[in-house]
Structures are given as structure tokens and as C-alpha cells.
């Protein structure tokens, strides 16, 4: 009989062993190799004593996966999922099961990274290109981005673009029609305040009365009215104003496109194309503009180029606009967007096709027609006389109607002026309309849905004016017209998935990206309807489960970070930076020090830091780093003193972007505080802090947390993300507010930074599960294992490559940088060559040329096993041997496995391959491990220059499919 106790047999800590890659025997072998007795010994060697936490986290003990699911189920059950007719940018939708199972719930799609290595990302690049094509077709404009965070932040980006491209250079007014969604107005006002723009909100027709650089309109508007803006847009453009339009994606299937009315920019949420409401997100925003504004477009763009064989290949285009290159001069700070959700929306369009989408749109419109006709027949006053899906109206006894709605588990839109609204959706049925009649009119109204439908068919409907009915064809490309059976759709999705390398194939060791395990159990609650089908503006007593989950998660994160409060609204890391800087800005203003507008940023900082500071209206002063990669304290002190009167803050990452725990971090905080500034500690590297130290204990005032890095939300191929901010008590009154949902914690004048009050709320259960399952023991062990894995890889590779920076005791933190510049000088082999050659070995390349050009930054995370680390090390050592052959002249510098990487099936089938100085086996099966688990890149190295010089960001011409 076993002598283990029942507690031991219950295995409450089993998930810790599931999450952490190396088992205890492997851990000891690795510790022996790096020269440490234990994980605690290694921790003490690496983490400066002055900042060690010295206590257990107050997040509870680890628990089993079934126990964790049972716990979160209690929260889900407290959410009351009413039928929602609120609309306002969030609608019921049906996620096709083939997409839910094969994309949304498939690690081949949700664990991939942003496609910076396009040769191993052709599948999701095609899906995103489809999203761009969909966006362009529906809006009637030329060039679309790969997705933005949500409709409201897209509106803020549209305003910024308008200012950049408007020829009305002296104008400083941006006009917003007063029937734009209130959350959008809120977010735009927040951004405008930072830029110093004047916002005027008024009736759309009054826009021509102002000298503007841009204007924003909603199509269809908050009340459901459809307006032909053609003449107004022309009048505004005559005055050199840039016209931007927030549009409903489903309505555009049926309505005249804003582009054909003359709009310059069109954006909106793609949520109702098969993505659940999720209490606010995540959802992809589309953003489309004219070709002449392409250099000013925010976010990523997928473009068509060619590979070295001249074959069509996809890549991210015009990256010189983006924050990781242009920093404070970038068009936007956006980095992570909403790629997974954009892919879902594009697959939704592919699966239904233009005819299927038209049927869905027509059904939604017919239900709105029936509802409106019934109300009019009973003498109800309608607010709008045109509509696609939304009918607004007034009733004599609004309170009684609202009471009947709640009793029937129905949510109507209730405006402050007493107007009620009903927005039909894909999920709405004829039975729902009958119930709505009962709610609005009371019993005994005598209306019959079928009879009204027959009358509409017989007599027609003028709710969409004839001149606003879409006449042009949409989605004519073969991709949108051939995958309408589930068999074909399933195979199309799988065919694209097979082109991409994600975590379900091999380690992705991207430094500063923390590509750790996204456990299946953590992901499961995201699919539950109790979380997915909640409208973000529903009465708060219906979202009690969300409220309690968010409160508990906030308390855990407060304890982990050492801060006093959390704000969950930012829906990306870059959005979190912006929100944190706004809190600092408002704090200074509250003290009569609004002139403090200088942000110090070390030269090693992430590109989002200066881009976010610029968005927040700050002036950037760069501080130097010393030869060891640390912040140069003398330079910092000198510059802090120089700008002391205007010093707002410093943005600093910890551990540093160079992968070490800087000994002077607390001193950095003290210097800034002495000069009246605040400390923004970038949370990108929190995976080396959790349970060992914390931003609050170090001395920082505010941080964002990348929940899609440290806290297990998957990267989704480029989003979704979540970037909540933690703040000290003095900054808590200045975090983001919301125009629609009041939390009661922040000041009334705090603007929103995202469309929804809790950002992408439906993915917060992933982080809740991560912390719940690991507990305080597992969180600390995970951080320690991240350190061990990084130091193991560093020491193994240091015999073959120079390691650029180390900290105390020649250790690194959770990532290391290898310096390829000496090898490049000696052999001509570039960091790009090595990155592409790793594709042949079945690996995604580490982070390339950041934070130092000519380097690779490697972050293995705690989730990778010793076997996988050894396979990666074997690949890197083998590549070093290949470089040696180039150095020795055995292989020509312009014809070797590195220069020609990656290799495809077409290469080894090519009869001319024999002219190469290396074998086919060397090209594609360089090690036994590769033979056992081969990943095939589907294109050769892509020509970036060709792609930017011949910009094409739409699906291939139809002739390519013949």
C-alpha cells in the first residue's frame, strides 16, 4: 500500500508540473550545469537582494484543473445572459462551429506570434489578407490595415490620420457628429486632449460651419438612422477637411459604401462577423483609407511580394511606419492588434460568401422592418425613419416597458433622454420579435409577425432609401466563393494552418515576448456562453460573475505587482502604456503642475514606449546606456536635473530589455522622484518578476501588464492582448473612466482609452485560471524556471556565440542576447540568414536586432522542456558550424544553406539543386531531430523591398485562381 497521504494523492499541485517544462530530474541536471545548487540558490545569485520580495504571494495555493474549472464555473453561473438588443457596436452573432473548433479553439491558430517571420506564417497572412480584402470591398476604399483594437480606438487613429494628411494645416478642430456612439466620442476626446485638438460635437449638418482638419460620422448612427452623406462629405472636402466614418460591417453588405459617398477613412468593428460580444471584447476593428494616405495608415498591413523563386508570397508591408522602427515618430503606438479575431471574421465571410452574408443582412433588416411596422401600426412614435437593424422609439410608459423587458430577460437600449432602442442581430428570431411586441406594447396588441412580413413583401419597404441600397458586387474573389460546405471550409482552414509555425509545433524563443504555454484548461472558459454572450453595457447586476471575477483577479494582480489598484480597460500593452501615462499626466495637472511633460526613456526601450509617450502629448528625452547595457546613471542624473522643472516621468523596463536585473533600479526611481517625476515601469518583462520582486516594491508608480505574455493569454498571431495597468494609490483616481458604464472609482472627467469598460473582458478568465491553477507556489516556480531555462541556454550557447550582456555573477534574467556582429564581420552571414536558417531546423527565430542591431534575443520561458531547449541549442550549434564553413571558404558567401534559407520542397525537387555546394539533406534535414518532426516553409525568402515598392494589399487577381 502507498504511504502517501490523501493530500499528496489529490495532486493539487499537478498543474505546476504540467505548466513547467523540465521535470525535477532535468531541473537538477540543468542546475548542475549552470553551477547552482537549487532554484533558490540561482534566484539569490541573480536577483538583487535589495528588491527581493521576501514573502509568499497572497493568491492562494495551487489547485487541480478540474477544481479550477469548477471554481470559475461558479462565476460564469452568476452572469445572467439576457437577450440583448442594446446594439451600440455589440450584437449577437453565431460563430460557425467549423470556425470555433478549427480556429478559435485551435492552438495552431491561437498560439502563433505576429508574422515577423513571414516564410513560416503564410497561412495566417492569407487569412489576414482576406480580412483586408473584405474590409476594402465593404467600405469602397483602397487600402486596409490588418486590424486595430476596437472601433473607438480606431476612431482616435482616424482623427490622428486626418491631422497628418489634412491640407487644412492651420485648422485644429475635429468635429464629431452627436449621433456617434458615446463610447467612441469618449475615446476620441481622450486622445484629442493629449494632442491639443479642439473637439466640437454637434448635429452632423453643422460640420460645415467650422474650420476643420477632420470630421467623424456614424453610418448607421446611434439611433439607427441611415444618412446619405455624399453632399456633406463633398462640402467638407472642399474645405480641406478629412472625412472619417464609423460604419457597421453587417449593414455594409446591404448599404451603399461610405467610400462611394466620398469618405476618406472608414473603420468599425468586425465583431458581428462571427465573434462573440464577450462583455466588450476582444474584437477586430477594420480600418480602410485611400491609397494616397497609405504612409499614414496606423497598424500593420499585409502586402503581396515575391520570394527568391519569383513566387507570390505575403508579408507585413511598410513596417517603417511602425513603432518598433520609427519609435516616437511612428503613426501609432499600436503593436499587438486583434489578428485572431480578424481571422475569425475573415473566415466567417469566406464560409458564408457574399450570398450567405446578404441573406443574413436581409433577415436582420426584415426583422427590423417587421418590428417598426408593428410599432407604427399601434401609434408608437419612431425616432428614426430609416434603418438597417436598429429602431429607436418613444413610448408613453417607458418604465413599464423596461420592467416587462427585464421580466422577460431582455435588454433594450435605454438612452438618457427616454428614447428606447432595439437593434436586431443575426441571433434574433421571429419569436423574439413577437416577444418584443409584448414588451413594448403589453399583451393584447394583436400583432402577428407572419402577417406583417407578408404585408412588407406585398407593399415593399422604404426603410433603406433606394439611393442608399448597395448596387455594386462584393467579395467576388474566388476565396469568398468556393468554401461554403463544411468539408471544404475545414480543409481550407487546415491548409492555411499547416503553413504556419506555432507553439503546437515547437518552441518560439522570441525575446521580450514570453511565448509560454497557453494551457487548454485555461482557455476553455473563453468558449462558455456565460462569458461570451454578455453585452458590455448590460445592467451591471446581470454581470455579477464578471464583476466578482474581475475584482478577484484585480486583487491578485495588485498583490503580484505591489501596487494599490488596477484598471482593466486597456486592451493591449501599448494601450496600457498610453493609459498609464495619462494617469501620470492627470496627476500632475491635479497638483497644478500640468507643465510637466518631459518623459525620460532609455535608448534600449521598446519602441512602444516613445510612441506611447508621444501619443500622451509628452516630449521625449533619451537617456544613454553604459557598455554593460544598463541605464547610465550619470547621464540619467544629469538629464533629470536638466529637465527637473518639466519632468513628468521615466519609462523603464525591468529586468532591462538587455535581459539583466539592473542593480540600480531603485536608485533610478529615487532620482526621478527627487525631481518631482513619476516612474512608469514597463511590464513587458514581468515574467522575471512574479513572486521574486515587484514593480511596487522596487519603487515604481505605474505599470502595464501584458496578460498575453506573463499571464498566459495567447498571442493569437498578433492579438488579442490585454494591458491592464497597476497604479499606486495617488494615481488611482486618474485611471481611465467610461462614458457609458460608471465604475465609481475614478474621477468623473477621466476619459476612456478603449471602447468597453473592461477592454477585452472575455479573455480575462484565461489569466484568472492561470493564477488559480498555479497558486503562489507555481507562480514563483514559473519565474525561477524562466531564469533557469534562460541561463541554461545562455551558458550552452556561450561556447559558440558571444553573449552580449550579463548581470551579477555572470547571469542573465529570463532572456539572453547573443551578439552576431563579429560573425557577420568575419563571414558575411547576417542575423537574417541565421533567423531564416532556423526555419529549416523547425524553429521560429528569436527576436532579431532588438534591442541591439545585429543580435538575437532568446527567451525560452518556463514552459519549454529540457529536450526542446537541447533541440534548439543543437540547431544553433549546428548553424555555428555552418557559419564556420563559410568563414573557411568551404561554402561561398552567396551560395550556402544560410544565405539560401529557408528551403522549400520546391528547392529539393529542383534539378538545378545539384549545382549547390551542399546536399539536399543538409538543406532540409540537417539533424536527426528535424527528420523526426519536419516543418516545411512554403515559400523561400521573401523580398521585402519588392513588396514595398510594388504595394499590393488585396487578394490575388482572379486570374491567379484559373
Curated annotation (Swiss-Prot):
InterPro entries: GcvP (IPR003437), GDC-P_C (IPR049316), GDC-P_N (IPR049315), GDC_P (IPR020581), PyrdxlP-dep_Trfase (IPR015424), PyrdxlP-dep_Trfase_major (IPR015421), PyrdxlP-dep_Trfase_small (IPR015422). SUPFAM superfamilies: PLP-dependent transferases. Its cofactor is pyridoxal 5'-phosphate. It comes from the Bacteria. GO terms for biological process: glycine decarboxylation via glycine cleavage system. Belongs to the GcvP family. This is Glycine dehydrogenase (decarboxylating).
Amino acid at each position: 500500500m502507498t504511504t502517501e497521504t490523501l493530500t499528496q494523492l489529490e495532486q493539487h499541485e499537478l498543474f505546476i508540473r504540467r505548466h513547467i517544462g523540465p521535470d525535477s530530474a532535468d531541473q537538477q541536471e540543468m542546475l548542475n550545469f549552470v553551477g547552482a545548487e537549487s532554484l533558490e540558490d540561482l534566484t539569490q545569485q541573480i536577483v538583487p537582494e535589495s528588491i527581493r520580495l521576501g514573502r509568499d504571494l497572497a493568491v492562494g495555493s495551487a489547485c487541480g484543473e478540474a477544481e479550477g474549472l469548477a471554481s470559475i464555473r461558479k462565476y460564469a453561473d452568476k452572469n445572467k445572459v439576457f437577450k440583448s438588443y442594446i446594439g451600440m457596436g455589440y450584437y449577437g452573432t453565431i460563430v460557425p462551429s467549423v470556425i470555433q473548433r478549427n480556429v478559435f479553439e485551435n492552438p495552431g491558430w491561437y498560439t502563433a506570434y505576429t508574422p515577423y517571420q513571414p516564410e513560416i506564417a503564410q497561412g495566417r497572412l492569407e487569412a489576414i489578407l482576406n480580412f483586408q480584402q473584405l474590409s476594402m470591398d465593404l467600405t469602397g476604399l483602397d487600402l486596409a490595415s490588418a486590424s486595430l483594437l476596437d472601433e473607438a480606438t480606431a476612431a482616435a487613429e482616424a482623427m490622428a490620420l486626418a491631422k497628418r494628411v489634412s491640407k487644412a494645416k492651420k485648422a485644429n478642430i475635429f468635429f464629431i457628429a452627436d449621433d456617434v456612439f458615446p463610447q467612441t466620442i469618449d475615446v476620441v476626446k481622450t486622445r484629442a486632449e493629449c494632442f491639443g485638438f479642439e473637439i466640437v460635437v454637434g448635429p452632423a449638418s453643422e460640420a460645415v460651419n467650422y474650420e476643420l482638419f477632420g470630421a467623424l460620422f456614424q453610418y448607421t448612427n446611434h439611433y439607427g438612422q441611415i444618412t446619405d452623406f455624399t453632399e456633406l462629405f463633398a462640402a467638407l472636402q472642399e474645405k480641406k477637411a478629412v472625412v472619417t466614418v464609423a460604419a457597421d460591417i453587417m449593414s455594409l453588405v446591404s448599404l451603399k459604401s461610405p467610400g462611394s459617398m466620398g469618405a476618406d477613412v472608414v473603420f468599425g468593428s468586425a465583431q458581428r462577423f462571427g465573434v462573440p460580444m464577450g462583455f466588450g471584447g476582444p474584437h477586430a476593428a477594420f480600418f480602410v483609407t485611400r491609397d494616397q494616405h497609405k504612409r499614414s495608415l496606423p497598424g500593420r498591413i499585409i502586402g503581396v511580394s515575391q520570394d527568391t523563386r519569383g513566387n507570390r508570397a505575403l508579408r507585413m508591408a511598410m513596417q517603417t511606419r511602425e513603432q518598433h522602427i520609427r519609435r516616437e515618430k511612428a503613426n501609432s503606438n499600436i503593436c499587438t492588434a486583434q489578428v485572431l479575431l480578424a481571422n475569425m471574421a475573415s473566415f466567417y465571410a469566406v464560409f458564408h460568401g457574399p450570398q450567405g452574408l446578404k441573406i443574413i443582412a436581409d433577415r436582420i433588416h426584415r426583422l427590423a422592418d417587421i418590428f417598426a411596422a408593428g410599432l407604427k401600426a399601434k401609434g408608437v412614435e419612431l425616432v428614426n425613419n430609416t434603418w438597417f437593424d436598429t429602431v429607436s422609439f418613444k413610448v408613453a410608459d417607458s418604465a413599464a416597458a423596461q420592467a416587462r423587458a427585464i421580466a422577460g430577460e431582455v435588454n433594450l437600449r435605454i438612452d438618457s433622454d427616454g428614447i428606447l432602442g432595439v437593434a436586431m442581430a443575426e441571433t434574433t428570431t421571429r419569436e423574439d420579435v413577437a416577444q418584443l411586441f409584448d414588451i413594448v406594447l403589453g399583451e393584447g396588441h394583436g400583432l402577428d409577425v407572419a402577417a406583417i412580413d407578408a404585408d412588407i413583401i406585398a407593399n415593399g419597404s422604404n426603410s433603406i432609401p433606394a439611393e442608399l441600397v448597395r448596387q455594386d458586387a462584393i467579395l467576388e474573389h474566388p476565396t469568398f466563393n468556393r468554401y461554403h460546405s463544411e468539408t471544404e471550409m475545414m480543409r481550407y482552414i487546415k491548409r492555411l494552418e499547416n503553413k504556419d509555425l506555432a507553439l503546437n509545433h515547437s518552441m518560439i524563443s522570441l525575446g521580450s515576448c514570453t511565448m509560454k504555454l497557453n494551457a487548454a484548461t485555461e482557455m476553455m472558459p473563453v468558449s462558455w456562453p456565460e462569458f461570451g454572450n454578455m453585452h458590455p453595457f448590460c445592467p451591471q447586476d446581470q454581470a455579477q460573475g464578471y464583476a466578482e471575477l474581475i475584482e478577484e483577479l484585480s486583487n491578485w494582480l495588485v498583490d503580484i505587482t505591489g501596487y494599490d489598484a488596477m484598471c482593466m480597460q486597456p486592451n493591449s500593452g501599448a494601450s496600457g502604456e498610453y493609459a498609464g501615462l495619462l494617469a501620470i499626466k492627470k496627476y500632475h495637472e491635479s497638483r497644478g503642475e500640468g507643465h510637466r511633460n518631459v518623459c525620460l526613456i532609455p535608448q534600449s526601450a521598446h519602441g512602444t514606449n516613445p510612441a506611447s509617450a508621444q501619443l500622451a502629448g509628452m516630449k521625449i528625452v533619451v537617456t544613454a546606456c553604459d557598455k554593460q547595457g544598463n541605464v547610465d546613471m550619470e547621464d540619467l542624473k544629469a538629464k533629470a536635473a536638466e529637465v527637473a522643472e518639466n519632468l513628468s516621468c521615466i519609462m523603464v523596463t525591468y529586468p532591462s530589455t538587455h535581459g539583466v536585473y539592473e542593480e540600480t533600479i531603485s536608485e533610478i526611481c529615487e532620482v526621478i522622484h527627487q525631481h518631482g517625476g513619476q516612474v512608469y515601469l514597463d511590464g513587458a518583462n514581468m515574467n522575471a518578476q512574479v513572486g521574486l520582486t515587484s514593480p511596487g516594491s522596487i519603487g515604481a508608480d505605474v505599470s502595464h501588464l501584458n496578460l498575453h505574455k506573463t499571464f498566459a493569454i495567447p498571442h493569437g498571431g498578433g492579438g488579442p492582448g490585454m494591458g491592464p495597468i497597476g497604479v499606486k494609490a495617488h494615481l488611482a483616481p486618474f485611471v481611465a473612466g467610461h462614458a457609458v458604464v460608471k465604475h465609481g472609482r475614478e474621477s468623473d472627467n477621466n476619459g476612456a482609452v478603449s471602447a468597453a469598460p473592461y477592454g477585452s473582458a472575455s479573455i480575462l478568465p484565461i489569466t484568472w485560471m492561470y493564477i488559480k491553477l498555479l497558486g503562489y507556489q507555481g507562480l514563483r516556480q514559473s519565474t525561477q524556471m524562466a531564469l533557469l531555462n534562460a541561463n541554461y541556454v545562455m551558458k550552452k550557447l556561450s561556447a559558440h556565440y558571444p553573449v552580449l550582456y550579463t548581470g551579477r555573477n555572470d547571469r542573465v534574467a529570463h532572456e539572453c542576447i547573443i551578439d552576431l556582429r563579429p560573425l557577420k564581420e568575419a563571414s558575411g552571414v547576417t542575423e537574417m540568414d541565421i533567423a531564416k536558417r532556423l526555419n529549416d531546423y523547425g524553429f521560429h527565430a528569436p527576436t532579431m536586432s532588438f534591442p541591439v542591431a545585429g543580435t538575437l534575443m532568446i527567451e525560452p520561458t518556463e514552459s519549454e522542456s529540457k529536450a526542446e531547449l537541447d533541440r534548439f541549442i543543437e540547431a544553433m550549434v549546428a548553424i555555428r558550424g555552418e557559419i564556420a564553413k563559410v568563414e573557411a571558404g568551404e561554402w561561398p558567401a552567396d551560395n550556402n544553406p544560410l544565405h539560401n534559407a529557408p528551403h522549400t520542397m520546391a528547392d529539393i525537387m529542383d534539378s538545378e539543386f545539384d549545382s549547390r555546394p551542399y546536399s539536399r539533406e543538409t538543406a532540409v534535414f540537417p539533424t536527426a531531430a528535424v527528420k523526426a518532426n519536419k516543418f516545411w516553409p512554403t515559400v523561400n525568402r521573401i523580398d521585402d523591398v519588392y513588396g514595398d515598392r510594388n504595394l499590393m494589399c488585396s487578394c490575388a487577381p482572379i486570374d491567379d485562381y484559373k
